[in-house]
């Protein structure tokens, strides 16, 4: 395995260094080829490294950054005041080639804006999208995007997301000729926003996309599609609703029947069922798939859930490792060239999808 270096915005997220630093040490234990640049306030980070051994310390470096992008700051405001923040410094390390990827649990809008400003979108991509790979009930995986980078999306952006999602599903997840669907409130052609209906018409005429139509949110985990495309507002709400339901379900499995007097054989049966069902559905635990890749950039950026615990943030670090090893930006760029000639974007003129040059 080739050595690689990641930049961590350790100050971001709801819990900051108290979660991100222990997660960094956990990631170092799991990967002997990994070096981490911990970006943040040295006075806060250093005490949290007290338990790190000599070998771990040899693969750690603290990069000073005294300020933090506020979680409630407007993206435009956060970008203007971003100089010297842990998020911006971490992204600059990627831009300068000192790190191969950035991981942050900070403000999503600010991360998207700064990443677009510093790392630049790929040719033919208007705006990057947050993407994750979710497990489904057929024991396969579904690529879902956008998960919150772009609240309002027009039809062209949705088509671009579909192209990127299909490339990711085929090149990284290993799904041949992946099925692509648009998330909508119904399967009928007349349902949904204008942008969704327009994107549907455009996708039907893109020969490189195996477009299968609309999919409703209740079928997200059924395995009916390999790529599910939506705007960032809808995607974020859908993902967090699903995460909440899964957490409640797993919690109920553990607590069901506690405090009630039962026969010994009923207690044994209950415990066996709890363990069996927990194993069966544990792959749906949100902590196990934390970390959304900001797809469509010339560099690798992973957005962790802001409320991630140590285990979940360590998973986000591993997501960054895999994205770098699989050369996700390079593969996306290479495939986009075969779909859109350099400097062009899709345009629906009523006769199918043509191409027009960026102005």
Curated annotation (Swiss-Prot):
InterPro entries cross-referenced by the UniProt entry: FA_synthesis, Phospholipid_synth_PlsX-like
Family indicated by similarity: Belongs to the PlsX family.
Function per UniProt: Catalyzes the reversible formation of acyl-phosphate (acyl-PO(4)) from acyl-[acyl-carrier-protein] (acyl-ACP). This enzyme utilizes acyl-ACP as fatty acyl donor, but not acyl-CoA.
Keyword Lipid biosynthesis included in the entry's annotation: yes
Keywords, alphabetical: Cytoplasm, Lipid biosynthesis, Lipid metabolism, Phospholipid biosynthesis, Phospholipid metabolism, Transferase
Entry's localization field: Cytoplasm
Pathway stated in the Swiss-Prot or TrEMBL entry: Lipid metabolism; phospholipid metabolism
Example GO biological process: fatty acid biosynthetic process
Native species: Salmonella heidelberg (strain SL476)
GO cellular component, one term: cytoplasm
Protein name: Phosphate acyltransferase
Enzyme Commission (EC) number: 2.3.1.274
Reaction equations catalysed: a fatty acyl-[ACP] + phosphate = an acyl phosphate + holo-[ACP]
Description of how the protein assembles with itself and partners: Homodimer. Probably interacts with PlsY.
Any GO MF annotation of the entry: phosphate:acyl-[acyl carrier protein] acyltransferase activity
């Amino acid at each position: 395995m080739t050595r690689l270096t990641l930049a961590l915005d350790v100050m971001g997220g709801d819990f900051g260094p108290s979660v991100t630093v222990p997660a960094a040490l956990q990631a170092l234990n799991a990967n002997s080829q990994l070096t981490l640049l911990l970006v943040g306030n040295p006075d806060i980070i250093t005490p949290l490294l007290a338990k790190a051994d000599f070998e771990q310390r040899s693969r750690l470096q603290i990069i000073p950054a005294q300020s933090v992008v506020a979680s409630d700051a407007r993206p435009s405001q956060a970008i203007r005041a971003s100089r010297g923040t842990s998020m911006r410094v971490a992204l600059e390390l990627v831009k300068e080639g000192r790190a191969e990827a950035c991981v942050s649990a900070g403000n999503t809008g600010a991360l998207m804006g700064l990443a677009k400003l510093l790392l630049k979108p790929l040719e033919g991509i208007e705006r990057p999208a947050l993407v994750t790979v979710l497990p489904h009930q057929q024991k396969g995986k579904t690529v879902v995007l956008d998960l919150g980078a772009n609240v309002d999306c027009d039809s062209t952006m949705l088509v671009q997301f579909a192209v990127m999602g299909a490339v990711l599903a085929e090149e990284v997840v290993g799904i041949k000729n992946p099925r692509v669907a648009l998330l909508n409130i119904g399967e009928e052609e007349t349902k949904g926003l204008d942008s969704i209906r327009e994107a549907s018409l455009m996708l039907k005429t893109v020969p490189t996309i195996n477009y299968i139509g609309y999919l409703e949110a209740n079928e997200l985990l059924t395995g009916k599609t390999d790529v599910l495309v939506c705007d960032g507002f809808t995607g974020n709400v859908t993902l967090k609703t699903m995460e909440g339901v899964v957490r409640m379900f797993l919690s109920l499995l553990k607590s069901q029947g506690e405090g009630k007097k039962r026969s010994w054989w009923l207690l044994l049966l209950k415990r066996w069922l709890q363990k069996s069902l927990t194993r069966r559905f544990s792959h749906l635990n949100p902590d196990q798939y934390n970390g959304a890749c900001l797809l469509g950039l010339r560099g690798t950026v992973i957005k962790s859930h802001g409320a991630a615990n140590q285990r979940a943030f360590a998973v986000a670090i591993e997501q960054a490792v895999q994205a770098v090893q699989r050369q996700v930006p390079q593969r996306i760029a290479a495939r986009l060239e075969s779909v859109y000639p350099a400097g062009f974007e899709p345009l629906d003129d009523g006769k199918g999808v043509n191409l027009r040059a960026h102005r």
